């Protein structure tokens, strides 16, 4: 029930601006992006996705363990290739990309806490799986936003982790006894229903940082909650990446692996990206009509999140009807959340009567 709150997001989250310092602006659609929803009529009248795509119209994800340097490398890649950078989707992704953009109370954001997970990963209130379920839905929403941006503008995107790598945390949680087998089954069912609807990244970049070095970086970072992460949990994340994620992704997209010191040279990474052939994976089989159906899906965020809620009773993510109704009504009272985007006068929307 708690996950149903994610479906409160508006049906369309418009793409944000270009990456700062883009070097290849001549290759990118840079006009003001129309906020009218794309549809069948637009496709018939000539809004063809293939006309917008070029050699840098790619989806690139940067993966790695905690504190592996994903953010820094992803930003550098996006800047040098003129792509849009998407920082890692967190608990507040849906709230910060919709409404007035302000983070919401935990009650409206999955009723979960990353800090609590670090402090007490075996908490008997179900926080660990509630967190993982919410983060998967947040990554799903972000991946849809990224695809919508690419297919609408032709500008490539760089993400930190994605729906394809999210499972590494689930496996680590289960191996460490943080969640039950029923939670794993529930997660895998949602993944089975949602993942096939999307196209995988064109390229995955994995930063391989040994667990001892990861722990050293965590200690240096100084987050009192994150510092409680065990080496066993970090090792399970690494194992899931290397034994499952990378082999599977290598079948459908390009994979580049770098040691921590190699990842410190983004120019070399960008050179490697430009030499990739991109000669495998489902992107090669797409045409304007398959792109049309994908665009119709990713712009409809309610549909994107539809199968993140399935009729299965799981105590970790289930709340009562009265509590759910109270939370829903409270959510609608928040600024910019009562009506669809553009129709909320309290957040400055104008000319509502003409829309």
UniProtKB/Swiss-Prot annotation:
Superkingdom field: Eukaryota
Transit peptide feature, positions: 1-35
Keyword field: Acetylation, Electron transport, FAD, Flavoprotein, Mitochondrion, Phosphoprotein, Respiratory chain, Transit peptide, Transport
Localization in the cell: Mitochondrion matrix
GO cellular component: mitochondrial inner membrane; mitochondrial matrix; mitochondrion; myelin sheath; respiratory chain complex I
Modified residues (Phosphoserine): 250
Names of required cofactors: FAD
Cofactor annotation remark: Binds 1 FAD per subunit.
Single GO term (MF): NADH dehydrogenase (ubiquinone) activity
The keyword Zinc is annotated on this UniProt entry: no
Residues found modified as N6-succinyllysine: 122, 285
GO biological process, one term: aerobic respiration
Function, as annotated: Accessory subunit of the mitochondrial membrane respiratory chain NADH dehydrogenase (Complex I), that is believed not to be involved in catalysis. Complex I functions in the transfer of electrons from NADH to the respiratory chain. The immediate electron acceptor for the enzyme is believed to be ubiquinone.
Subunit structure: Complex I is composed of 45 different subunits. This a component of the hydrophobic protein fraction.
Protein family (similarity comment): Belongs to the complex I NDUFA10 subunit family.
Matches recorded under PANTHER family: DEOXYNUCLEOSIDE KINASE (PTHR10513), NADH DEHYDROGENASE [UBIQUINONE] 1 ALPHA SUBCOMPLEX SUBUNIT 10, MITOCHONDRIAL (PTHR10513:SF15)
The protein, known as: NADH dehydrogenase [ubiquinone] 1 alpha subcomplex subunit 10, mitochondrial
């Amino acid at each position: 029930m708690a996950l149903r709150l994610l479906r409160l997001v508006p049906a369309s989250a418009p793409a944000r601006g270009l990456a700062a310092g883009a070097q290849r602006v001549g290759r990118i659609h840079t006009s003001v992006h129309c906020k009218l929803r794309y549809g069948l009529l637009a496709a018939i009248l000539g809004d063809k996705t293939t006309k917008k795509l070029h050699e840098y119209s790619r989806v690139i994800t940067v993966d790695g363990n905690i504190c592996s340097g994903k953010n820094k490398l992803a930003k550098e890649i996006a800047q040098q290739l003129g792509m849009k950078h998407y920082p890692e989707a967190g608990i507040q992704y849906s709230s910060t990309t919709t409404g007035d953009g302000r983070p919401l109370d935990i009650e409206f954001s999955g009723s979960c806490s990353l800090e609590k997970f670090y402090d007490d990963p075996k908490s008997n209130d179900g926080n660990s799986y509630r967190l993982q379920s919410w983060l998967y839905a947040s990554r799903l929403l972000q991946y849809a936003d990224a695809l919508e941006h690419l297919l609408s503008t032709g500008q490539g995107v760089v993400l930190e982790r994605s729906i394809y790598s999210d499972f590494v945390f689930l496996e680590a949680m289960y191996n460490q006894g943080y969640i039950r087998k029923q939670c794993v089954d529930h997660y895998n069912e949602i993944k089975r229903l949602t993942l096939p609807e999307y196209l995988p990244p064109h390229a995955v970049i994995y930063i391989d940082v040994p667990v001892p070095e990861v722990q050293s970086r965590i200690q240096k970072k100084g987050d009192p909650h994150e510092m409680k992460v065990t080496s066993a949990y970090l090792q399970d994340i690494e194992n899931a990446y290397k034994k499952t994620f990378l082999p599977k992704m290598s079948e459908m997209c390009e994979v580049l692996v770098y040691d921590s010191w190699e990842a410190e040279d983004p120019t070399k990474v960008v050179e490697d990206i430009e030499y990739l052939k991109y000669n495998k994976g489902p992107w090669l089989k797409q045409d304007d009509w398959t792109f049309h159906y994908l665009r119709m899906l990713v712009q409809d965020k309610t549909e994107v999140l539809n199968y993140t809620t399935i009729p299965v009773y799981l105590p970790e993510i289930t709340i009562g009807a009265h509590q759910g109704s109270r939370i829903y009504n409270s959510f609608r009272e928040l600024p910019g959340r009562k009506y669809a985007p553009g129709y909320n006068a309290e957040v400055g929307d104008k000319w509502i009567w003409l829309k």
